[in-house]
Structure formats: structure tokens, C-alpha cells
Amino acid sequence: MSMRFIVGRAGTGKSTLCRQEIHKESQEHPEGLPLILLVPEQATHQMEMSLAHDPQSGGILRAQVLSFRRLGWRVFSEVGGGGKAVIGEVGKRMLLRRLLLNHRSDLRVFARSATRPGMADLLAQAIAEFKIYRITPDQLRGIEDADELLLQKTHELAFLYEELNKSLGTAARDPDDELNLVAGKISQAPFLQGAKIWVDGFKGFTPQELYVIQAMLGTAAEITVSLPLDPELLKAGTPRFKPGEELFYEPRQTYQGLVDLAREAKASISHVFLTETHRFEKAGLKHLERFYNAYPTQTFPGGDDSTAPDPLGIALFPAANKRAEVEGVARELRRLAREEGRTWRDCSVVTRDLPGYQGIIEQVFNAHEIPYFLDHKRPVIHHPLLELLLSAIETVQKDWAYEPLFRCLKTDFFPCSKDRIDRLENYCLAYGIHGSAWKGNRSWSYYPDPNHKEETAGLNETRQIIYDLFSPFDQAIRPHPEAGGPSVTVAQITEAIYELLIRLKVPEHLQEWAEAAHSRGDLAEAQLQNQIWDAVIQVLDELVAGLGEEVMDLSDFAMILTSGLENLQLGLIPPGYDQVLVGSLDRSRNPETAVLFLLGANDGILPGKPSDEGVFDELERLRLESKGIMLAPKGKVQVYEEQYFIYTALTRAREQLYISYPLTDEEGRGLTVSPVIHRLKMIFPGLPEKYLSLDEEEPGALPHPYALLPAYALHLQKLRQGSSLSPLWQAIRLWFLSQTAAFPQVQLLEKGLRDQNEEGKLPQPLARQLYGKRLVTSVSRLELFARCPFAHFAQYGLKLKERSNYRLSPPDMGQFFHAVLHDYAIALRERGLDWGELSKEQSWQLVNETAEPIALQLQNKILLSNARYRYLTHKLKRTVHHAVRVLGEHARQGVFLPMELEVKFGPQEALPPLEVPLSGGNSLLLRGQIDRIDGAVLGHEIYLRIFDYKSREAHVSLNQIYHGLDLQLLAYLDAALQGAQILVSSSGLAEGSKGSEGSEGSEDSEDSTIHPAGFLYFPVLEPQLKSKTLLYPEQLEKDRIKAVKVKGYLLADRQVLLAMDRDLENSSLLGIKLTKSGEFKKGSPILTEEQFALLRKHLQHFLRCSGEALLEGDISITPYRQGKHTACQFCSYKPLCHFDPYLPENNYRNLPVIQDEEFWQRVQSQDSEQYPEQHPPTSVPGETSRRALQKDGGNSPRGQELIWLGEDEAGAGKEDDGHE
């Protein structure tokens, strides 16, 4: 029984000596007792490979490479004790999550954070630390004379620690307890009796691991432990470390602990001191290892190879940023492979900040076609299988809600194509299908159009497949306490999950994905797909082992399972032999390598900052230590540990060490270099540096062609913008053009150089086929065309539209307002009532009567779908009620009467269309729907006023009219005036007029002249008032009515305006202001009749110009811009047009702001031939039009179903399908 120490600094051959001794033993005694090489878990694969490929070892017939965990398995397999189910790290976190939920009321310190994400992780780490350092719950409870917070913490941790052990019971075991169990059974393990054991690759051991070593001392013939330690420290026997020696702090402490164990066991102790370094082939690397931590500084004096091209073997790579840094490393790796014949496995890349570099390394190395292996555990929370588990449970929990259900369906495990799932999703979104609508055998038939029967049948087939697969899972885990059904246990839920996975053939899918990854050369992905099934099943097994018989609701189960799956990580072994190893500096074992790249040498990263995470802070750990509770070292010891990590990284390379660091972060802010760089420059004055940037021009620095493609695209863009290519890039371009078969992306990039992001014109025959010889269009279409011709083409030519969604949008609310106001007016007319006659209570009652049936028809009864929408319905009714109160005030103050409601004009409609002749015998016909036309007879004159309801504040200006951005009111007025005789005849206006002061009703409307009285936007809004004083209800009502302002233009005729508001001088309804002399104030929204005529002429001019442009095929990407407003602000087609104002061919149409005076000057200066006079018909057309008006103009109740009528808020009356 003996313990032997192999002690030496980095590169002195400790691991080599261990392998040589194992080789010698196996050669001398081929059939002797086992030769065990005990190494860190991460190094087992690497050491097995080393032994297997060592030509002297003869393989590993006697030798066994074990980690402490594998050693435990071997012991249990020989002597028993390993039959219990193992609850791993994931399982413990799930158990702790459950304990926190169950005992939250018993906790004080941890109560508030019990449900906080990550709390179970912190507690699991704390309890694991207690077990590893062999601290019992009783020891925690026994702490006295500490502050109250620390005492409460330790008592609560002791409670949770004990409850966790109880949860594990006798049926399961915690891996953190295994080494204690292993130590107790080692004496019974035959394979360890008389065995020789080498322990290599450790700088320190936990108390549990020391316990195992102590147990092996009693059975093994000899234990050899290699330690990375300067032999001079042991020879000197110094009790304290000198400056620079702190990096050996942990190995020195470990050595002392092992010596104490050996002496206690009365084992003999011997030493092998290795003082000569054998690893380093460059004098600089050898000097660096010996003197990096030596004080005073030992400057490199040169050496035997000082005349060689690179006597140091060390180079610094400052870089512009992280991407430039990794790009430079990738180029150097390819150069080493190309020029020096290096294999990929000769090179390693390490960093202290692997998460910060991982994504960039993956992108850049893939682009350079550098095979690499990322040595870290992969989190798999975003894997489709885990998403399936969590979304399936959430789907049942939320009763088949849309969002979790379609997350579940999009995992690709259901036997439905992506296209079928997408179509199903669109359908469900459009009609608000969720919950009970999925269940049962009732088919869906929400499409109102019978032409969709075939598509509906396909959707129902897909729904049935999903329901048949998913409903057994729903029924199995859904508790039914109201029906007296049994509660559901964790085991039952888990069994149902497993059965769902089998029904969906998840293992087969994963196997297919693994094979596909393997076939495309992604071996790491193939490994992951092969491992994920077993990992998930292990999590479910651990859940059952720990909580199987516990009754649990789905929300708690989902929370616990989520906490477990979030911590699920998979460790992969290198899938290929010749790969660049990419790893983190703090791994337990970083292997020796020929060439090493150390990335991220910045302050705060190298060395890393000591971690303050955990249940206990540094001060609390010191207090616990004073009470005899020894935990993992923190603070100062972590600083020593960081120095050791740096030492390890600097001494891994045999031939070449590259150290790189970015000078700026992603936002261009400067970064400070690491103290390591300053130290290196002190030791090696004149250390070579090479600055890395993304704009390299030296041919020797060119990367792999695939990695050049982004830079190639950038240079082509510069070429397109007028710059010239350097000779190097001219040569690169010629080479790429000769290799288009190997690089198909080049053709696309070159095409982009020639292509312009612009659309010309459709061929005229195609435009006429698309829009028709008689171009039937609407105001909203022409306004869109004025904003951007391409947007008009996308919406009305290509007929693109956004996905329908089952929600109440602003257009839906506008539709509701229009419908209620229409039916309210019809109800008044049928009851012989006037708008101004009803009291507030009576109008509210009538609004309710008219709104209820409309709410049933809107968006598949969306207003009745839940409590929120039912409340919103009440608010919408209040808004409409306020609108009718304001309209009632208009009626009380004036003599204008509603003539017709929702009057359609267009081909085959009540009123004729606005028709404009175009060139080539073509014509434009404008159609639409006018919300409300009011009329008044003043003397022998008839005046018409247009109202258009808006569910928002709307304004109209001459500037907008001039540019065609807002033509709605003007077009409606023009249509009403053209069909005025039809309106007057059908409405009986002349006979039913209230008259006005000084006027009488006309006896013969045929002899009356019809004039425009104005056009107005009426906002259907419920204003919110602010007042510093308390208002009585009557005053509040008046103020709220005054707050609703109509916007538009009115006729500049005092008699006409008095007919609208008899209190004109103090008008709150029209926004008209008068001077003391009774004149109109400047800025009042009034126009003369001649100006209304000019507006109508301008409309005709605009319609003609727009019609000609449409039929000429104008689909140009030319959005307007005026001030801060552009056509692109709320455009849905930006992903389609790719408009980019920075491209030379993409420019806004900058529209000047036209002031009112300039507007009239421009309109009046136009050639009169451009404005053909258009007179209203002098005689009433035939009875067909009159009957059509009586049928469609608003005299009958609304039909059975509401149909959204487009951008005009029920403006067009039917779909804008282009041509007649």
C-alpha cells in the first residue's frame, strides 16, 4: 500500500509518464491485475484515444480509463447497490421545484423567490455542494451564534435538503451521493484488489473524491497521483506562497490533503519530480512557461533557435472586433493547413468566453469549411421534441387554445405537411377557432362561400387526423373533478406523454433526422438527434421515480417539467478524428496541442471575474467556515484559479501560440486589453503583432472562397455605387466568374449588380386585360394609386392580402358604427321620428335595439366571444349613442334632413357612376357608397350636404385633394350632384322640407336648382373631457356634444349655414367663426360655389390622369413623401417591393405642400379643355333607377350578414375586382 506523486510544471511529461508506466506494466504482465487510469470526466475519450493510438501501449487490454463516475458504475456492477433509479441533475431540479411550490408557506428567506426562474437551480447547486463537501442537514441546523439571516438560510436549506432526501426515498438515489456510497463498497470490489491506479489530469479533488481515494488506498497496490505543481515549492517546504506562485495554490493544497490521507492510512509516500520540460519546441514557449509568473520579470534572452524564422512561437492578433478576430483566426488556420501541412487536429481554439464567441465561430468556420468540434454541452430546450412536450401539455391546460396548439403542430411530428398546417392555421385565425370547436365529430363550415367546399373538406380531414392523435392524450391527463372523475397522478400524466410520443412515431422521426444530418456531413447534429430521445425518456423516468404517485394539476406539472427541460444538456463526443477542437478555458482538461489560438484576451474576460452567484455570498461563506462548514472556495481562491486557467492555456501549445483580442465591441466602443497582454509584452519586448480587420487586401490573407462571398457582395455593391475595384478584387471577381458552377451564389450576386430595384410598366394589353376597357374603380383604389402605384398593383392587380385574423380591428369597428347608424336611421324613419326628437334615454334604447343583431353578425360573433369583447360591445354602443346625440343636435339646430343613407353609385347602382372618357375609346367609371346625404330646400333652391362617418379623427385639405391623397368627400359630392334629381325625386325632399327662416318649401323640385352645401367627415367618437371643476350632467352632455367637430368644407352662404346651425354666431357644430360685423373669419372651412365647381373639375382631371396611368401599366415603386409622411409608413407590401431610399433608383416622389391660395391658382390656370363641364341630368332617368334607390338607398333594414366593404369604411359596396 503506497502513494506516489508525480510532480511537475506544465509540459514536463506527467501524463506521458503515466502512459509509459501503464505500457511497461502491460508489457511485463499482460494478464495481470487491472491498470486503472483515473482522469476527469471530460478527458476520458481523449485518454482512451491516446492509449489506443500509442504504438508502444499495445492497446488497452489491461488498462482501463475511468472517471470517478465510471469507477462508481464499475464498483456497483461488481458488488451491487446500483439498482436504484438515478435522479440526475434535471430530476433534482424538478423535485426541488415541487418542494418550493408545496412548502412556500413554510419558508421565509426563499418564499418570495420560490417561483422565480432559476431558483431551483440555485438550491440544487447549494445542496449538491453540501453533499460533495459531506455537509449534513444536522450540521447546518447546528450552526449557532450567526446573524439572523444566515441562520434562517441554513435552517431552510437544511429543511429542503432533508425533504429532497425524503422525496428520493429508498427507490431512487442522487448522483451526488454516489461517491460516498462507492467509497463504502470499494473494499468489496474484486477488480480494485491489488490494482495499480494512476490519477492524472486533476489539480484538485472534492472531499467526496478524496474519500474515494482514501478507500482505494486500502485495496490498491499503489496509487500514483500526478499534480501540476512546481517541484521547487515542495522541496523548499515553504508554508506561504511568494508572489507569482499563487497559481499553484490549489494543487499545493491538494498535495497536502493527499499526504495527510496517506499518513493516516499508514501508506508509504514517494515522489517523482519532473523538472525538465519536453513539450515545447520553441524557446519562447519554454521561457513563457517557466517565467510567466516569475517576479521580478525575466525578459526573454533568446535561445538556441533564436536565429530561426520564429524563435518565440508566440504572436499577438489585435482585431477590429470579434468577427474580424475570428475571421483572422480562420484565415490563419487555413494558411497553416495549406502552407505548413497542418492537420486540423493539430490546432485548438480556446477562450474564457465561449458563449460570447460560439455563434461567430460557428458562422465563420462553416463559411471557411473548417471542421471543428465545440467542446461544450448543448442545451436542447429549443429542440422540436421538447417543444412538443411543453406545448402539448399547455394545449390541454388552456383547452386547445390557438397558440400552444399550433406550436405543437409545427414541431413536424404530426403526419400533416407544413402546407396543410399553414392552411389550417390561417383558417383558425380567420374564424377564431379554438377550444370546443376542435372537439367532437362536428365538421367545420365557417366559409360562407360555397366555392370553398373542397378546401373546407381538406381542412376538416386535417383537423380529424390531429384530433384522433391528440384527443386520447387530452382525455388521459385532463382531470374531471366536477364529474367525480379521479385526480391525475404524475405517473399517469407521464405515461400519457409517452403514449402520445409513440402515436406520433417520434423515435422514427428522430432517426430520420439523424440519418439526414449524417448524409449531409453534420455528424454533431446526427449525434444530438440520436441522443435526444433517451435524454427525454430519462427526464420522464426521473419525474416518475421522484413524484410518480403524487397528484398534481397540469399547471404545476408543466412548471416542474419546464424547469427540468430547461436544464437538459447533451454532451457530445468529437464525431470526427481530424477536427479543430474549440473549447473553454475553464474545462477540467485542455489537451496538449501543436498550435493553440487563445481568443478574447480582454480585461474582464481574461482573467474572468470571480462569480458571486449562489445562495451564500463570500462573507457568509467565511462565517460558515469559521463554524466548521467548509464549502467550495470562492473569492481569493477563485482569483488564484483564474491565474491557473491562464497558465494552462499559455502552456498547451508545443509549437505556436496565437493570442487575439478585439479592440472594440459590437457597437464600436473601445475595449481594454487583458493584463495578460501587458505581461507578455514585458517578458517578450517586440512581440510580433498582426492587426486583423475585415477589409484585407493582401493576397496571402485571403480566406476560403466561400468565406469571401460576403466581402465579394460588399465590393459589388460598391461597384454598383460607382466605385472601382482594386486589382486584387478584379482578379477575385474574374476567378469567381469562371467558377459559377461551383459557386451558384455568384450568379445571383452578379445579377444584383445589373438589376435595379424598380418596376417599369405592364404591357398595355396586359394592363387592359387586368383592369378592363371600362375601368371600374373606387376612390380608395385611386387614393392608393396616388400614394404608390406599386402598392396599388400589389393589392388590386396581384390581389395580395394580409392573413385574416379573428380580432376586432379598426375597420371592424368602423363597420359596426356604420351599420348601427344606418339601422338607427331606418328605425327612426319607420317610426316617423326625427333625429332631434328623442330623449337621451329613448335614443340609448333605440341604439341597443339596433346594435344587438349587428353584434351577432360581426366577425363570426366576435363581440360575444368573451367577457372582454362583451365589455367592448358596451363601449361601442356608448360611442354610437354619443354620435346619434350629436347628429340629433345637428337636426335640432338646422333644417337639413337626411335624404338617403348608404347610397351606392356605379354601374347598375341607384346613382350612375362618375364616368370619365379616356384615350383609345376607354373610360373610367368610379363607384362607391355614400354614408349619408342631407338636403334642404331654401326658397326655390335645393342644397345637398355629404356626411361620411369615420371611426377616427379625419381631416381633409386642399393640399390632400390636389395630390389625390383624399378624394372621398369630393367624389361623393360630385356623384350626389350628378344624381341629384334621382335623389330629390325618391326622397320627397321638396314636400317634406322643414323649411328655414324666410323660406318655404318648393312646390316643384323639377324647377329647383341644386347646389352643393358642403361635405363633412363626421367622427364617431366618445370624447374624453378634462375639467378642473365639477360639471353637472346637463353641462357635461353639452360639452361632450360640442367636443365632436365635423371636418370638411361648407358653402360660403350665410343662409345655407344658418340652415345647418341657427346659432351660427356661436356655432359649436360647424367650426365656423364670424367677425363682429358678421363676416367669415379667415381660415374658416368655407368655399364659394365657383370653388366647389373648380374642385369637381380638378377631380375629373385627376380621374382622367389616374385612369390613363393605370391603363398604361404604371406599377412603379414610387411612394410619395410629404414632410414626415410617406406612403411606406403603414404599407404592408414593403417586404415585396424592397424600396430602399439609399439605392439610386429608389426615390420618393416628394410632393410639395400646396397652400390654399396656390391651390386655386394652379387649378384655375389649367387649360379649360382639361375640365369638361359636367352638368347634372336635367331630367329624372327611368323608373329603374328610382326603384333601385328605394331598394338600396337605405329604406329597408339591413340584410342577414354584414360584409366588410373595403378601405372606404363601407365605401365601395362590393369587391374592387377591376373591370366590368
Swiss-Prot record:
Binding annotation for [4Fe-4S] cluster: 788, 1128, 1131, 1137
Top-rank taxon: Bacteria
Cofactor(s) annotated in UniProt: Mg(2+); [4Fe-4S] cluster
Protein name in UniProt: ATP-dependent helicase/deoxyribonuclease subunit B
Biased composition (Polar residues): 1162-1171
Self-association state and partner proteins as the record states: Heterodimer of AddA and AddB.
A single BP term in Gene Ontology: double-strand break repair via homologous recombination
Purpose of the protein: The heterodimer acts as both an ATP-dependent DNA helicase and an ATP-dependent, dual-direction single-stranded exonuclease. Recognizes the chi site generating a DNA molecule suitable for the initiation of homologous recombination. The AddB subunit has 5' -> 3' nuclease activity but not helicase activity.
EC number, as in UniProt: 3.1.-.-
Domain annotation UvrD-like helicase ATP-binding: ranges: 1-281
Extra remark beyond the main annotation: Despite having conserved helicase domains, this subunit does not have helicase activity.
Cofactor: record remark: Binds 1 [4Fe-4S] cluster.
Signal peptide: none
Disordered: annotated segments: 989-1008, 1162-1220
Composition-biased stretches (Basic and acidic residues): 1211-1220
List of residues binding ATP: 8-15
Family under the similarity heading: Belongs to the helicase family. AddB/RexB type 1 subfamily.
Keywords: 4Fe-4S, ATP-binding, DNA damage, DNA repair, DNA-binding, Exonuclease, Helicase, Hydrolase, Iron, Iron-sulfur, Metal-binding, Nuclease, Nucleotide-binding
EC class (word): hydrolase
